[in-house]
């Protein structure tokens, strides 16, 4: 009788001591009082009409930049290999303590991702649209819960107090996995 991969993982999980990795999460609090957490990312993106949105990003109370873009991805290291990577953001080792800010299709030539300390507080504030129109945007937590926000609304994003604990059943390192993905296998 052959043993499947599931049997190997069951044995590692229940008979051996599996390695446990703690992964940081983000907490987002809207000025409307709504809040949620995300393991991968919090995305502020356009909603409604298919036009760029205007928004400001503050880090620890200081203006980082004003953007005209399709949105912005605020990512954890775990989420850096998902939407963040697709938008041109950096790959971050998943157990690192940092936050990545990546604009989505910015209407500027010099816009790049920024890597911040996990202790920084980020505020995304929705600005006024063209001709002083009210902007409509959407906030998404790990692509799940989506909340509409409007001109003047803010979301405060910081490291969550809780972490996600993952059982590491494979002995394959992050770098080996990354190397295989970069080769297309």
Residue ranges and their predicted role:
Residues 12-16, 45:
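Mid-sequence acidic-hydrophobic segments that form the walls
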Residues 44, 49, 60-63, 112-185:
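ATP/nucleoside-binding phosphotransfer catalytic cores, i.e., glycine-rich phosphate-binding loops
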Residues 10-13, 40:
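Charged, amphipathic alpha-helical segments
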Residues 1-9:
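Single conserved hydrophobic/aromatic residue that forms the stacking wall/gate
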Residues 22-110, 118-120, 179-184:
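ATP/pyrophosphate-binding catalytic subdomain of soluble kinases
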């Amino acid at each position: 009788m052959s043993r499947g991969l599931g049997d190997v993982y069951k044995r590692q999980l229940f008979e051996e001591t599996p390695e446990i990795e703690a992964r940081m999460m983000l907490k987002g609090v809207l000025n409307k009082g709504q809040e949620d957490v995300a393991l991968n990312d919090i995305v502020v993106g356009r909603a409604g009409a298919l036009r760029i949105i205007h928004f400001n990003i503050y880090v620890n109370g200081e203006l980082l930049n004003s953007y005209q873009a399709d949105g912005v991805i605020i990512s954890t290291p775990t989420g850096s290999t998902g939407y963040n990577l697709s938008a041109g953001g950096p790959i971050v080792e998943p157990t690192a303590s940092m936050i990545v800010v990546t604009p989505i299709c910015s209407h500027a030539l010099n816009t790049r991702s920024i890597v911040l300390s996990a202790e920084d507080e980020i505020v995304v504030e929705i600005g006024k649209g063209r001709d002083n129109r009210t902007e409509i945007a959407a906030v998404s937590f790990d692509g799940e819960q989506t909340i509409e926000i409007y001109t003047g609304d803010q979301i405060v994003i910081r490291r969550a107090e809780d972490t996600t604990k993952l059982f590491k059943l494979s002995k394959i390192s992050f770098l080996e996995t990354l190397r295989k993905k970069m080769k297309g296998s």
